[in-house]
């Protein structure tokens, strides 16, 4: 699947996948924008890949011009043959969430310094890349995995997916911890994330995410810009 690289198509994908973050009820969202953004088996050409990346980055930059004054930023984490992995987040809200010891301690054990958000995102992108196919590339030039236990990694291996990504999406701390400890098994409810504790609150949150997405999709279709969507939900 390849998606057209233009402002309307991209913004529609953002609204569909990131409305809770636009509305301020979730610190971050992650989605894949379909298309070929990394070379696999020599196809397509490097020039074609670079051209597609440049076009998408230009679209994202234009959206950031509108959203950054409103406290929202978006960036590509990883380029893959199946699509670009795009992270949309509220830096202030995310830093507040990550400053909790339940996140800080767990992330420090995986090589993150959450006091430095840009560096943490570089590290996250590197770890996702290591866990992906050989064709995947971090969107951060020269980024490497900082974990001592991953020093054995080479171009022919695939490392375990960094499930600590749940912290970077603002999921409940204990649910992220239990997901990692229990390897994604034995959960009570599966919605926006796998729930291990406080099912009732999680179900309420799932409902709010759905309602938010429906509402923002509706007013976006009436002609609102992304910035207007953010302001409408303040």
Show where each model-derived region lies:
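Short, extreme N-terminal leader segments that mark the start of a protein/domain
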Residues: 1-42
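Short, flexible, solvent-exposed loop/turn segments with mixed acidic/basic and small polar residues
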Residues: 18-23, 74-79, 125-127, 152-156
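Short, flexible/disordered intra-domain loops and linkers
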Residues: 39-53
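Hydrophobic/aromatic-rich, well-ordered segments within soluble, folded domains that form packed cores
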Residues: 159-189
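Long, compositionally biased
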Residues: 192-234
């Amino acid at each position: 699947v390849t998606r057209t690289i233009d402002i309307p198509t991209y913004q529609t994908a953002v609204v569909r996948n990131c409305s809770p973050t636009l509305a301020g009820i979730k610190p971050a969202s992650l989605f894949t924008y379909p298309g070929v953004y990394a070379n696999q088996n020599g196809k397509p050409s490097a020039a074609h890949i670079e051209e597609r990346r440049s076009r998408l980055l230009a679209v994202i930059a234009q959206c950031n011009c509108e959203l950054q004054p409103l406290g929202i930023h978006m960036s590509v984490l990883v380029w893959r043959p199946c699509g670009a992995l795009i992270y949309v987040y509220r830096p202030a809200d995310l830093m507040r969430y990550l400053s909790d010891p339940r996140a800080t301690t767990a992330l420090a054990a995986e090589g993150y310094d959450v006091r430095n958000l840009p560096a943490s995102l570089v590290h996250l992108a590197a770890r996702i890349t290591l866990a992906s196919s050989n064709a995947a590339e971090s969107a951060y030039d020269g980024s490497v995995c900082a974990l001592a236990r991953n020093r054995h990694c080479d171009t022919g291996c695939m490392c375990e997916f960094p499930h600590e990504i749940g912290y970077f999406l603002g999921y409940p701390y204990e649910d992220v911890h239990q997901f990692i400890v229990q390897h994604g098994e034995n959960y009570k409810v599966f919605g926006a994330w796998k729930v291990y504790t406080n099912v009732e609150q999680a179900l309420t949150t799932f409902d709010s995410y759905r309602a938010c997405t429906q509402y923002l999709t509706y007013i976006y279709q009436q002609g609102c810009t992304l910035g207007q969507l953010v302001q409408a939900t303040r």
